[in-house]
Amino acid sequence: MKLNDLRDNEGARKGRIRVGRGIGSGKGKTGGRGQKGQKSRSGVAIKGFEGGQMPLHMRLPKRGFNNPFGKDFAEVNIGMVQKFIDAKKLDGKKDITEEALREAGLVRGGKDGVRLLGKGELKAKVKFIVAGASKGAVEAVEKAGGSVEVIPAAQPEHEKKAARSEANKKAKAKAE
């Protein structure tokens, strides 16, 4: 075998077809796009379609799940609280509550309240009133002479049930 004898396998290379060049070619008029519809128009890309190749979002595995009962806490470290006290953005003499942390701009979000974490060092003697706290955070606050009061975030479950029952009553009344 010589280099000049090398050839591609039969059918490995396919000539390109010029479409839309008259009905005699067999690929005229609609050019192999069928009749009307999104795929017949120009400038359209089907989202996520990669020309028949398995798309990236389908190649990657599914992972995890959304826990309907999971708690959503805004987390704050005691080191950051100390920085805000030093910068006079938080008053170290008053109780530090969720509202105080939000007003100071230390936390955002967290529909189930604020959770205190133990990263950093706390020098000020402060009382925290939060929805949750880690063991390390509680130890660090008590070591500095302060205290942590854990109050679970108020869950207006009865309000949710009342709203649901009212909605159901309205739906039944509308159906009748």
From Swiss-Prot:
Q: Does Electron transport show up as a keyword for this record?
A: no
State how it assembles: Part of the 50S ribosomal subunit.
Top-level division of the source organism's lineage: Bacteria
Q: What is this protein called?
A: Large ribosomal subunit protein uL15
Similarity annotation: Belongs to the universal ribosomal protein uL15 family.
How is this protein annotated for GO cellular component? cytosolic large ribosomal subunit
Tell me, what does this protein do in biology?
Binds to the 23S rRNA.
Query: InterPro entries of this UniProt entry?
Result: Ribosomal_uL15, Ribosomal_uL15/eL18, Ribosomal_uL15/eL18_sf, Ribosomal_uL15_bac-type, Ribosomal_uL15_CS
Ranges of biased composition (kind: Basic and acidic residues): 1-13, 156-176
Q: Where is the composition biased (Gly residues)?
A: 21-35
Q: Which UniProt keywords apply?
A: Ribonucleoprotein, Ribosomal protein, RNA-binding, rRNA-binding
What NCBIfam families does the record point to? rplO_bact
A GO biological process this protein is involved in? translation
Q: Where are the transmembrane segments?
A: none
One Pfam family, short name: Ribosomal_L27A
Q: Which gene encodes it?
A: rplO
